[in-house]
From Swiss-Prot:
PANTHER family: ELONGATION FACTOR 1-GAMMA, FACTOR 1 GAMMA, PUTATIVE-RELATED. It comes from Trypanosoma cruzi. This is Elongation factor 1-gamma. InterPro entries: EF-GSTs, EF1B_G_C, EF1B_G_C_sf, Glutathione-S-Trfase_C-like, Glutathione-S-Trfase_C_sf, Glutathione_S-Trfase, Glutathione_S-Trfase_N, GST_C. Residues 212-265 are annotated as: Disordered. Probably plays a role in anchoring the complex to other cellular components. EF-1 is composed of four subunits: alpha, beta, delta, and gamma. Residues 255-411 form the EF-1-gamma C-terminal domain. The keyword NAD does not apply. Residues 90-216 form the GST C-terminal domain. Residues 214-223 have a biased composition (Gly residues). The keyword Secreted does not apply. Residues 3-84 form the GST N-terminal domain.
Length: 411
């Protein structure tokens, strides 16, 4: 099976990045064909066989072509080889995926369109532009209040489509973008769950994608970059209509992780994880931890959620921890953690114990968006806090200030 994605390639091309990320998550091989807008797409053959409006992206298969990015997304999801059910597990879930793909286009993309035109064409923003954004994000926030993912219990291409649509809201709305991430935290959590998947990160880096608030563009949209020239702006504006033209971005070499270059430690984290999983915590695993712990090669932290007053429903708090751990997936090799929900059903706190490779907080942990949502306290002397650490490892004990409702282990 041969799949070729015809597209203009640019660090700002969210539609193409969405498709490449979905293909990576689905373990579906897709070859990217960099095209020049105004050439291949304007030929009669292209309009007759690929896209009648002469737009990118187009997916070329052995049987024919598919145009429109969400239609391509559906096709990739139907070819899913990951075993992750990216198009849902049942016919109903498949239809629910479809409804969120429609939502991403008719609601999220439509609400961001004035900001895209403002950034790339210099068009004035309508006075009520943010009203529409808040209306859409309020609806999304309410849906995610009781759910980790948009459909079912696992990530689907619905989450991928909505996350990449959200990207423009966070990056193009100037100062409002950051405020949106704080006001609609469930939506931002879901966004980060998609964007911090290792395969998504690899796709974005390989395409030279930019992160954070967009720099450059129209006045007030960023700093540090000159405004695009007229020709570039016109090409970029076409991105809003699905017809981008950009230059091939240089591939970024994968940098070694500094944690892999640390000297060997007598405390083997994987060995402790096996002890913790297979033996009694108080009598075997905890003593093993203190016997082998290497203070020169590891750092232990307490952490506490900053917004515990917002925790109203236990299952929602559990989902918050689950999403946090998913976004820490790339850190698993270098970390062990226990997160506890303590208190009562409708009034409870998140507290946690973490052990990280190296001295201090690793950069790869600092880069996880959730890290800033917690207050962190380094344990200066692990042996001196043996009782408290043992209680946290065991999910019970006198040093835990409130009853433990449930817990989750990162190992």
């Amino acid at each position: 099976m041969s799949l070729t994605l015809w597209s203009g390639v640019n660090p700002e091309n969210a539609r193409t990045h969405k498709l490449l990320a979905a293909a990576a998550l689905a373990n579906v091989a897709v070859t990217l064909k960099a095209c020049e807008y105004g050439r291949e797409n304007e030929t009669a053959e292209y309009c007759r066989n690929c896209s009648p409006c002469g737009r990118y992206p187009v997916l070329q298969t052995e049987e024919g072509c598919v145009f429109e990015s969400n239609a391509i997304l559906r096709h990739i999801a139907r070819l899913d080889r990951s075993g992750g059910f990216l198009y849902g597990r049942t016919p109903l879930e498949g239809s629910q995926v479809d409804m969120w793909l429609d939502f991403s286009a008719t609601e999220l993309d439509a609400a961001s369109e004035p900001f895209v035109h403002h950034a790339f064409r210099g068009e004035p923003l309508p006075a009520n532009a943010m009203d529409r954004v808040h209306e859409v994000l309020r609806a999304l926030e309410a849906w995610l209040e009781t759910r980790t993912f948009l459909v079912g219990e696992r990530m689907t291409v619905a989450d991928v489509a909505v996350a990449f649509a959200l990207q423009w809201h966070y990056r193009l709305n100037g100062a409002e973008g950051e405020a949106l991430t704080k006001k609609y935290r469930n939506a931002y959590r879901m966004y980060n769950t998609v964007m911090q998947q290792p395969k998504t990160v690899e796709v974005l880096r390989s395409q030279g994608a930019t992160f954070g608030a967009r720099e450059g563009g129209a006045k007030g949209q960023g700093r540090g970059c000159a405004r695009p020239g007229r020709e570039e702006a016109e090409r970029a504006a076409a991105a809003a209509d699905g017809a981008e033209e950009e230059d091939e971005a240089p591939r970024e070499k994968k940098k070694p992780n500094p944690l892999d270059e640390l000297p060997p430690s007598p405390f083997v984290l994987d060995a402790f994880k096996r002890e913790y999983s297979n033996t009694d915590t108080r009598t075997v695993a905890a003593p093993y931890f203190f016997q082998h712990y290497d203070a020169a090669g590891y750092t232990t932290f307490w952490c506490r959620y900053k917004y515990n007053e917002d925790n109203k429903m236990q299952f929602m708090t559990a989902n918050l921890i689950r999403g946090w751990f998913q976004r820490m997936e790339h850190v698993r090799k270098y970390a062990f953690g226990v997160a506890l929900i303590i208190g009562e059903e409708r009034r409870h706190d998140i507290v946690a114990l973490w052990v990280f490779r190296g001295r201090g907080m690793p950069a790869i942990v600092e880069d996880v968006e959730d890290t800033e949502l917690f207050d962190w306290e380094e344990v200066a002397d692990v042996a001196a806090q043996r009782e408290r650490i043992t209680d946290y490892l065991s999910w019970e004990g006198p040093t835990i200030p409130r009853p433990v409702l449930e817990g989750r282990v990162f190992k």
